[in-house]
Amino acid sequence: MIAIMWQFEVKAGSETEFEELYGVEGEWTTLNRHTRSYLGTSFLHDQNRSSRYIVIEYWSEMVVYEQHRVFRSDEIALLEERSRALVDAVEPLGIFTALDVPDRFGPTWSKRK
């Protein structure tokens, strides 16, 4: 399993729209769900700095993530354009390999309602 992390600095007044785009029912998460190897997303909001968010996507393997990016490149480009209008900065934090993955029970976080 891999985890891909980004940090976003969201423009003042754009927080709600940003949360709707990347949240559990958002278009970004919905697009990722089309790929079976997408395992879910952690969507974090900094308690001390209201403009800062962390997004962590979980995928079964890197090659599938890369194929998803190619296959859905047009849709991804449109969503990234919308995201750019809402943020001051995006910083990729890295791609991480899970060293110890606990057993999962129930649906992935991205599929919970």
Name these PLM-found stretches.
Residues 2-9, 39-71:
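Short, well-ordered beta-strand segments in beta-rich or mixed alpha/beta enzyme
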Residues 23-40, 58-96:
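An amphipathic, aromatic/His-enriched active-site/gating alpha helix that lines ligand/cofactor pockets
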